[in-house]
Regions:
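DNA-binding alpha-helical recognition surfaces that contact promoter or target DNA
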Residues: 209, 225-226, 420, 466, ...
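Alpha-helical residues within the helix-turn-helix
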Residues: 61, 311, 479, 497, ...
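Short alpha-helical "packing" element that flanks the helix-turn-helix/winged-helix DNA-binding module
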Residues: 160, 191, 365, 461-464, ...
Length: 524
């Protein structure tokens, strides 16, 4: 993949969303540029169908973000299938209907688990798997719609991606919608998304054969006819090493440059989207960005550098989308392969962001947040001679913020204890002592009070929402607030009604957007 054009100083909307699609590819277990290649296939089919510019634009962006809800349902999906990324990757080669679907789901339930645990997972799936899959996909759609709105993609894209898992034959999930009731944009995306994988794996002839086999079952026969009637033209150029410029040329707004506030809004939304993958990380990226920026200001960095540092904090964890959630939550030892997957995530963060014109500095800072002065960090293991002041500040800010947040294997620690930990790491040569001092000072600064509630929630409901957003069950919420479990459930029902969300992920995004999730480290 080529670097972004250094002459481009204002990110373009299509570039930012194309970069997001690269991160989504990682979460699907596909190589980066899968969705970009599929978008080329989809828009070329749209052209041959005769769709107008608006409809064609819906096809393009629906293809790029059709899986945008997949991170929101990652905790629930990994509870069912252990490795949610392997599960998603496994859906492409199989026509998921009837016995094929049952065999696939049962096989995935045991995938990567010891025999006894795998057997129990299969039994749970047999007992109530259909209900849980329906709930999971409804959650996916709700979260995908909310995120699409925040990305400014419009009602057409939102409607299309609400049909991502439906099928032409009406056997899809969760609603069993079929035939022309599925928006034409999504019927095109259904074909393009699967066919790109087959094209890359086995070539044009195999891709055409697969489309014909699934015509009338998963795929709209008329869309398949368009593909098979002009396959050579539709597939042209997709075998080139770098498809980025070709895919961007198909965008409905390839030259639409964004203002600074528009870029900020997109990057904040992307950071929130990354955090929703883990209930314990809600609001993490926003807090890291704010903390790093305050530390940069205290160090006297130029405002342009502080702005880049803040942005890097918002999106520093983008590459985490390529790591199964179970690896982050595993308390036991990791295999060497699993450790390598984790060590590579900052590399993918930098590689993805580096494609966007105007974000080169952001990409460099974000990609170095796990590096250490003594060379003990990752992904590159560079030492202090290669680490800029902003990179050192972000490393300290991300480390402190993580320590003050609860994780599966440990409770959150207070600010004073977290600072002492960072000071020890600085004394050992891992973190920069000046960066640690600046971050500690910034973390101790009084933060602006959140403005008065404009959410329609009561004070108690906000307390309940703050706990639900970080993964607490109704029973845990009841225990922490000293209320009954029934009262906690009632509060959650009222919260969902008032906020217009229907699931944990939606509630988490709402809480982060409205400042209800804790905004900074605990001071104890």
């Amino acid at each position: 993949m080529l670097a972004a054009d250094p002459a481009s100083t204002r990110p373009r909307r299509a570039e930012v969303l194309a970069a997001l699609s690269l991160a989504l590819d990682l979460g699907l277990g596909q190589p980066m540029e899968h969705m970009l290649r599929a978008a080329v296939i989809a828009t070329r089919m749209a052209d041959r169908i005769g769709m107008d510019a608006t409809e064609r634009g819906v096809v393009y962006y629906a293809e790029l973000v059709s899986w945008i809800g997949c991170q929101a349902d990652s905790p629930e999906l990994s509870a069912l299938f252990a490795d949610e990324i392997a599960f998603r990757a496994g859906t492409f080669p199989i026509d998921l209907r009837g016995r094929n679907r049952a065999r696939f789901l049962l096989g995935q339930a045991g995938h990567g688990r010891p025999p006894l645990a795998g057997g129990r997972a299969r039994l749970r799936l047999l007992a109530d798997g259909r209900r849980r899959m329906h709930e999971l996909l409804e959650s996916h759609y709700a979260s995908a719609g909310a995120l699409a709105d925040r990305l400014g993609l419009g009602a057409g894209v939102r409607d299309a991606i609400h049909h991502t898992f439906e099928r032409w034959d009406g056997t899809g999930l969760p609603r069993g919608i079929g035939g022309p009731a599925i928006p034409i944009a999504m019927r095109i995306v259904h074909v393009a998304d699967v066919i790109e994988v087959q094209l890359r794996a086995a070539g044009p002839e195999a891709a055409v054969q697969l489309a014909r086999r699934r015509s009338g079952t998963q795929f709209d026969p008329q869309v398949v006819a368009v593909l098979t009637g002009a396959a050579d033209e539709i597939f042209a150029g997709l075998d080139q090493q770098d498809v980025w410029p070709l895919a961007l040329s198909q965008a409905p707004d390839p030259r639409l440059a964004l203002s600074d506030p528009e870029v900020d809004a997109l990057l904040i939304a992307i950071g929130d989207f990354v955090d929703v993958k883990s209930p314990r990380r809600q609001g993490h990226s926003r807090r890291v960005g704010a903390l790093a920026a305050r530390a940069g200001q205290s160090r006297g960095l130029p405002e342009t550098t502080v702005h880049a540092l803040r942005r890097a904090g918002w999106v520093h964890d983008l590459g985490r989308l390529g790591v199964p959630g179970a690896l982050w939550d595993r308390s036991g030892p990791l295999s060497s392969a699993d450790r390598e997957r984790i060590r590579l995530y900052p590399y993918f963060t930098q590689r993805i962001l580096g494609r966007v014109g105007g974000l080169a500095e952001v990409a460099e800072i974000a990609g170095a947040h796990r590096e250490r002065l003594d060379g003990s960090g990752f992904p590159r293991g560079v030492d202090g001679s290669s680490l800029s002041v902003p990179a050192r500040l972000l490393a300290a800010a991300a480390r402190l913020q993580s320590l003050t947040e609860e994780r599966l294997d440990r409770p959150a620690v207070g600010l004073a204890q977290a600072v002492r930990t960072l000071e020890r790491e600085a004394a050992a040569g891992a973190l920069d002592a000046q960066a640690v001092a600046a971050v500690a000072d910034a973390a101790g600064q009084p933060q602006p009070r959140r403005r008065a509630r404009a959410t329609g929630l009561t004070a108690r409901e906000e307390q309940v929402l703050a706990l639900a957003a970080v993964g607490r069950s109704s029973r845990q919420i009841a225990a922490e607030l000293t209320i009954s479990e029934k009262t906690a459930r009632n509060h959650l029902e009222h919260i969902y009604t008032k906020t217009g969300v229907s699931n944990r992920a939606g509630a988490s995004l709402f809480a982060v957007q409205h400042g209800i999730v804790r905004a900074g480290p605990p001071t104890g």
